[in-house]
């Protein structure tokens, strides 16, 4: 699950990992997401999310509904803000959480990364320098 655009593209690039697994997607209902995820099960979430209390409340309701319907064992996200309610509700429901910090933040954290870092089961970074910001992270290198 993640915002459309680059965040969703990062997740899609992990196709060798997820292609044979049961899955669903949560992202913005935008043309790029619909095109990329054609034929996939997709739930739309509310946007814009930029530091918006209204978006957080709406996406928390969506997260509650989707996660209670789907009951995932694992939630993976590359951000952005829409990940926060899904991760916290997912954690309460017993799902394992994997967060992949964005590629273009090398020496400082993202707001979403800061918010989900304490509850993730695996926090992945793409640069060794990011481990200074997230000491418990695992550096798997670039997704690209």
PLM feature spans:
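Histidine-centered beta-alpha loop that forms part of the nucleotide-sugar donor binding/catalytic region
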Residues: 3-4, 80, 101-104
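Short amphipathic alpha-helix
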Residues: 7-19, 30
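Short, well-ordered alpha-helical microsegments
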Residues: 7-10, 33, 83-86, 108-109
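An amphipathic, basic-hydrophobic alpha-helix
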Residues: 51-73
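Active-site-proximal region of nucleotide-activated glycan assembly enzymes
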Residues: 95-144
